[in-house]
Amino acid sequence: VEDEQDFEKLLADLHERFPNMGYLVQNANGTSIVEFYLPEDAKLPEDISQRWPIEELGYDNQQWLDDLRGKFKGVNVAGTRILPPWEEHCEDDLLIYPGMAFGTGEHASTQLALVLLSILPLQGKSLLDVGTGSGILAIYAKKRGCSKVTGVDIDPISVENALDNAKLNDVDISFEVADAYELKGEYDVVSANLVTDLLLGLREVLQPLAREFLVLSGIPFEDYDKIVESFGEPYLAVFGEDWIAFLYRRT
């Protein structure tokens, strides 16, 4: 994918249609190569396969994980090293095993959400992570001092992956399979790294859930006005690689 906006649309579209998708991005000579991994029974929609040149390869789970082992080396975000467990690490690092779930820390939307969480007073707070994927945001919040953290995802594979990652980091987090539209209760902080249309559809759910702070990410910059029109002007917005994340503060 040579056009940056096309790349963003492709990734957002794939993530929306296949929420348990694992992926890696490689950049070479101005071209982004997106490797995405789908379950064996998943069928790629024709509108995607016709728009971009796509090569399909068959992997069993072990081949896929072996392939990731050679490609995912980790990243440094908001002062925290995010690493796979096979890399040399220390207690302060956040460990993520790249399973079939979104969130290794390499994508800008995840990084922007982490940046916003890093500036919040999380010590002793409760946090709900909606669409938790690999659990990366929830685990980060727990390691930063949140007293109670809950992560929810509609996809059971993602929840399994998140539970595995919580064990890797020796943190106690409640991960549950749940429909975001049915969420109730109140949490000091709510994070949601989703796609724009889903965030817009969940506005009436997300806002009452957040007692103090609401973090929204997964938003291409071109959707800035859509989010502001629905949620209002943010307390803070951060940008990176043509993506944007919003922080709302309840007063």
Briefly describe each language-model feature range.
Residues 62-122:
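SAM-dependent Rossmann-like transferase core, predominantly class I methyltransferases
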Residues 50-59, 92-96, 230-238:
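Active-site regions of enzymes building and remodeling cell-envelope glycoconjugates
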Residues 19-20, 146, 210-211:
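A structural motif
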Residues 92, 126, 188-189:
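Structural motif
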Residues 100, 104-182:
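Conserved SAM/SAH cofactor-binding pocket of Class I
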Residues 1-89:
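N-terminal auxiliary segments of SAM/dcSAM-dependent transferases
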Residues 115, 154-250:
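S-adenosylmethionine
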Residues 22, 53-55, 81, 126, ...:
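Conserved beta-strand segments of alpha/beta enzyme cores
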